[in-house]
């Protein structure tokens, strides 16, 4: 089983984001990058979905992406956007970056958040971070340890793509393991091929996150809830952080 952004998970990544109809982060990232002079780094730039438009808007931004398939998609779709293939954990920039942006919960895939926040602090004074909080999993709205239908997409080639998810959550340890099953079906509904992946994510309560940021030398300049949408529960939080 793959652990990261290969096969259907890479190929269908953008179609599933579109199907979710969530607000795009590109406006927030554009706002954050407005006053950053010099080169910024986008960690986990994926298929270029957000990197491409930001480079086209003339931000001095380069991508870093560890999945070769995602890098290939990005280079094909947005040839002007520079992307380095590699993992953040092995990355050492030549100079300090004007800023580093990590949208779309990529930071939560890091197994050692404290160490990586310290490394980020060494490589920039300005950090953009978006994190999600798994309310639906914690409240039991989504069943634990059983497969459920997540989303479906129509493929341009006529087939359909289906995503099913199965998760295990440990509230105490702040860890969520999600299995994804991607199934391609032909026009008659017969299965053409199915693939599975597994993701381990960390999540943080408000208090735990603020302690972690304080310990690693980050101060919150701005916090935006739910990408600007109003809701009583905070599912997604975006932080503009400054090294102190
Ligand atoms: C949730 S996807 C988001 C992709 C992109 N930011 C977007 O919003 O379209 C996470 C991406 O981060 C990449 N990634 C995960 N861990 C990484 C790491 N340690 N270093 C570099 N890239 C990483 C994955 O391969 C994947 O493409």
What is the meaning of each model-derived region?
Residues 200-244:
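C-terminal lobe and adjacent flexible extensions of AdoMet/dcAdoMet transferase-like proteins
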Residues 98-112:
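A short SAM/SAH-binding and catalytic strip from SAM-dependent methyltransferases
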Residues 1-46:
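Conserved class I S-adenosyl-L-methionine
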Residues 48-90:
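Class I SAM-dependent methyltransferase SAM/SAH-binding core
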Residues 114-126:
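A short glycine-rich, Lys/Arg-flanked "PGG" loop and its adjoining helix->strand segment in the class I
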Residues 39, 60, 126:
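Residues at the starts of beta-strands that form the adenosine-phosphate
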Residues 130-207:
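SAM-dependent methyltransferase
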């Amino acid at each position: 089983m793959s652990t990261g952004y290969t096969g259907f998970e890479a190929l269908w990544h953008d179609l599933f984001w579109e199907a979710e109809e969530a607000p795009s982060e590109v406006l927030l990232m554009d706002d954050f990058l407005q006053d950053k002079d010099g080169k910024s780094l986008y960690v986990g730039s994926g298929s270029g979905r957000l990197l491409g438009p930001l480079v086209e808007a003339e931000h001095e931004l380069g991508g870093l992406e560890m999945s070769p398939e995602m890098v290939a998609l990005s280079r094909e779709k947005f040839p002007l956007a520079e992307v380095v293939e590699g993992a953040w954990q092995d990355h050492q920039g030549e100079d300090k970056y004007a800023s580093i942006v990590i949208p779309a919960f990529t930071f939560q895939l890091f197994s050692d958040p404290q160490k990586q926040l310290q490394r980020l602090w060494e490589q920039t004074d300005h950090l953009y971070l978006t994190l999600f909080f798994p309310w639906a999993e914690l409240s039991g709205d989504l069943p634990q340890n059983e497969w459920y239908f997540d989303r479906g997409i129509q493929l341009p080639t006529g087939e359909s793509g289906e995503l099913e998810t199965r998760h295990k959550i440990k509230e105490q340890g702040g860890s969520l393991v999600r299995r994804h099953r991607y199934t391609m079906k032909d026009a008659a509904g017969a299965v053409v091929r199915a693939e599975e992946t597994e993701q381990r994510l960390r999540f943080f309560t408000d208090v735990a996150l603020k302690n972690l940021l304080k310990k690693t030398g980050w101060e919150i300049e701005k916090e935006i809830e739910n990408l600007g949408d109003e809701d009583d529960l905070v599912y997604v939080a975006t932080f503009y952080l400054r090294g102190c």
